[in-house]
Amino acid sequence: MDKLDLVNDGLDIIDFIQKNQKEIQKTYGRSSIQQPSTKDRTRAWEDFLQSTSGEHEQAEGGMPKNDGGTEGRNVEDLSSVTSSDGTIGQRVSNTRAWAEDPDDIQLDPMVTDVVYHDHGGECTGHGPSSSPERGWSYHMSGTHDGNVRAVPDTKVLPNAPKTTVPEEVREIDLIGLEDKFASAGLNPAAVPFVPKNQSTPTEEPPVIPEYYYGSGRRGDLSKSPPRGNVNLDSIKIYTSDDEDENQLEYEDEFAKSSSEVVIDTTPEDNDSINQEEVVGDPSDQGLEHPFPLGKFPEKEETPDVRRKDSLMQDSCKRGGVPKRLPMLSEEFECSGSDDPIIQELEREGSHPGGSLRLREPPQSSGNSRNQPDRQLKTGDAASPGGVQRPGTPMPKSRIMPIKKGHRREVSICWDGRRAWVEEWCNPVCSRITPQPRKQECYCGECPTECSQCCHEE
């Protein structure tokens, strides 16, 4: 069935619908003409393929079944000798080429055409390589060893020898190849799949700031972060073209900030560190306190207060000395008022007057320096000066035992051009937030102050 027949059938269907439009039952805008069932369409396709190819029988599973012999084949369609001297002539192919009729279906996976360029080198597009300039085309022969025979065009190459192939050999070769590919269902022109070599080592991932500080790192956590000095250039990220100008600008900005990041060091680095930076309890080192217990002088809070974390305290106990790295800023204090929620509470009067910064409370003994008080009033006496601090429960008249503490959180922030570390404290009952934000107590049992932050100074 060619294109003209298909077009005529379509026109006949349109005429039938137009003539019987009034008789067709209307079902809410949908046509009552139903499509044939899948079984009917499958049977119609089987009949079409059998009538077109004439050499395959459809099996029950839908796969073509080859008879394996030459009785059901039309030998004249496969090959024919047109010249009297025995040379190869033009053979009629049972394969429909896409170049001639792109709408037809290619029935066989094997192209068996050998075409002379009788019209001045115009190529029909058959074969794996066709070149009108050369005047000859390749032909995939039916030999079982996979040889390729090049049939020259005698008109373009008159001195080429004439090749004679017995008709029986050609029939056996073509039938053998067609049986082989038809039974296997393979495409001879397909390119074999070559998998990639998975054993080739890939490039190492780029260094990210989370690797050094242990926050936000996914994957293998068994490897400890590197100790000692950290290359700060690896976490400087500049997206502007003026890198030199931006670098000078942010170096000046970091120089103004005295907040520093504390990382762990090994005892071997102790010789190159000033002893004035040794942080720890004087009682642990055999020294006496410069002031009596409970009589600490009030210190004036300055912006260059140095915060230390548990990593620093652990390094002191192991014999290491903390080392400070400049040019990384911790911008949020433990109870800072930069959060918009806290500022809104202050405007509403929930936190009247008073400073939001933490002060060091009196200490009863040196051994209980890092331990929170187990009996605190959550009323006016819960905070120094009778000031209600953000993130604390509402005042109550009874004494409530403290069952929960605080959680120290660290976040590495990045504004597109630089990265810095922010650290803050939240009650244990509050949610863990990806951004630095002071959360309020939900259970009413958390302390009003973080004992770790209060006893650091």
From Swiss-Prot:
Pfam families: Paramyxo_PNT, Soyouz_module, zf-Paramyx-P. Zn(2+) 1 binds at H406, C425, C450, C453. Zn(2+) 2 binds at C429, C441, C443, C446. The modification Phosphoserine is found at S257, S350. The keyword Ligase does not apply. Residues 28-37, 77-96 have a biased composition (Polar residues). GO terms for molecular function: importin-alpha family protein binding; metal ion binding; small GTPase binding. Keywords: Host cytoplasm, Host-virus interaction, Inhibition of host innate immune response by virus, Inhibition of host interferon signaling pathway by virus, Inhibition of host MDA5 by virus, Inhibition of host RLR pathway by virus, Inhibition of host STAT1 by virus, Inhibition of host STAT2 by virus, Interferon antiviral system evasion, Metal-binding, Phosphoprotein, Viral immunoevasion, Zinc. Its main location: host cell. Residues 240-252 have a biased composition (Acidic residues). GO terms for cellular component: host cell; host cell cytoplasm. The keyword Phosphoprotein applies. It is found in: Host cytoplasm. Residues 26-104, 193-403 are annotated as: Disordered. It comes from the Viruses. Residues 296-317 have a biased composition (Basic and acidic residues). Gene3D superfamilies: 4.10.80.340, 6.10.250.2490. GO terms for biological process: intracellular transport of virus; response to leptomycin B; symbiont-mediated suppression of host cytoplasmic pattern recognition receptor signaling pathway via inhibition of MDA-5 activity; symbiont-mediated suppression of host JAK-STAT cascade via inhibition of STAT1 activity; symbiont-mediated suppression of host JAK-STAT cascade via inhibition of STAT2 activity; symbiont-mediated suppression of host type I interferon-mediated signaling pathway. Belongs to the paramyxoviruses V protein family. Plays an essential role in the inhibition of host immune response. Prevents the establishment of cellular antiviral state by blocking interferon-alpha/beta (IFN-alpha/beta) production and signaling pathway. Interacts with host IFIH1/MDA5 and DHX58/LGP2 to inhibit the transduction pathway involved in the activation of IFN-beta promoter, thus protecting the virus against cell antiviral state. Blocks the type I interferon signaling pathway by interacting with host STAT1 and STAT2 and thereby inhibiting their phosphorylation and subsequent nuclear translocation. Interacts with host IFIH1/MDA5, DHX58/LGP2, STAT1 and STAT2. The P/V/C gene has two overlapping open reading frames. One encodes the P/V/W proteins and the other the C protein. This is Non-structural protein V. It comes from Hendra virus (isolate Horse/Autralia/Hendra/1994). The gene is P/V/C.
